[in-house]
From Swiss-Prot:
The encoding gene: aat
Function: Functions in the N-end rule pathway of protein degradation where it conjugates Leu, Phe and, less efficiently, Met from aminoacyl-tRNAs to the N-termini of proteins containing an N-terminal arginine or lysine.
SS bonds (residue pairs): none
Matching PANTHER family: LEUCYL/PHENYLALANYL-TRNA--PROTEIN TRANSFERASE (PTHR30098), LEUCYL_PHENYLALANYL-TRNA--PROTEIN TRANSFERASE (PTHR30098:SF2)
Compartments, record wording: Cytoplasm
Keyword Repressor: no
Record InterPro entries: Acyl_CoA_acyltransferase (IPR016181), Leu/Phe-tRNA_Trfase (IPR004616), Leu/Phe-tRNA_Trfase_C (IPR042203), Leu/Phe-tRNA_Trfase_N (IPR042221)
Stored Pfam families: Leu_Phe_trans
Name this polypeptide is given: Leucyl/phenylalanyl-tRNA--protein transferase
GO terms under cellular component: cytoplasm
GO terms of biological process kind: protein catabolic process
Organism, scientific name: Pseudomonas putida (strain W619)
Domain of life: Bacteria
Length: 226
């Protein structure tokens, strides 16, 4: 049975209560307050729903993750990185990145980044929890992504690309930055061919929970101002 959250409690049900069909649906309801969002990621779940639906909280099994030392950079991507065609920065325009991620896409109906969700993650950015990666070409924003940094874990949320391989350049730059800062895992949530080509793979929900338990409260040395 699906658990419905109330606004006066930040407690989530155990991850083992998540449904098998649809895979990983853990709870519904509640709100997107900064406190609840932080608690959700610490617990191992994330919000994902369409505009007009109640807030839905997910913890899929398996979970798609990328370990920084398993990053795969193809020869063509490595060549592109060496060419320096794109300029990559961190936290220089979080609102523009999340707006670009929320923009309609040819292959999708609507967007799951609602105005309420946008405002919630912008508040997390103001609190120093959510971060953005900007990829520019000749000063124009052509790619990027955003997510949350907590302890030695980074929780990726969404990315976009308006130029060939722009999001891949941003992602690879982020992974290398996180690795240097002591991060041990990047949560990619759901599988995509795009992420698998970069080295992401599936681990069990239980294994993911172990990483949360051991690394959420460990310090990192990441600097987010470019």
């Amino acid at each position: 049975m699906l658990t419905w959250l109330t606004r006066d409690s930040l407690t989530f049900p155990p991850l083992e209560k998540a449904l098998q069909d649809p895979n990983g649906l853990l709870a519904a309801g509640g709100d997107l307050s900064p406190e609840r969002l932080v608690q959700a990621y610490r617990h191992g779940c994330f919000p994902w729903y369409q505009d007009g639906q109640p807030i839905l909280w997910w913890s899929p099994d398996p979970r798609t993750v990328l370990f920084p030392n398993e990053l795969h950079v193809s020869r063509s991507l490595a060549k592109l990185l060496r060419q320096g065609r794109y300029q990559v920065s961190f936290d220089t325009d979080f609102p523009a990145v999340i707006d670009a991620c929320a923009a309609p896409r040819d292959y999708a109906d609507g967007t799951w980044i609602t105005d309420t969700m946008r405002n919630a993650y912008c508040e997390l950015h103001r609190r120093g929890i959510a971060h953005s990666v900007e990829v520019r070409h000749n000063g124009e924003l052509v790619g990027g992504l955003y997510g949350l940094a907590m302890g030695r874990l980074f929780f990726g949320e969404s990315m976009f690309s308006r130029a060939d391989n722009a999001s891949k350049v941003g992602f690879v730059t982020l992974v290398k930055h996180l690795q240097e800062a002591g991060f041990v895992l990047i949560d990619c949530q759901m599988p995509t061919d795009h992420l698998h080509s970069l080295g992401a793979r599936a681990i069990s929900r239980a294994s993911f929970a172990d990483y949360l338990a051991h690394h959420l409260d460990q310090p990192n040395s990441a600097s987010w101002r470019s």
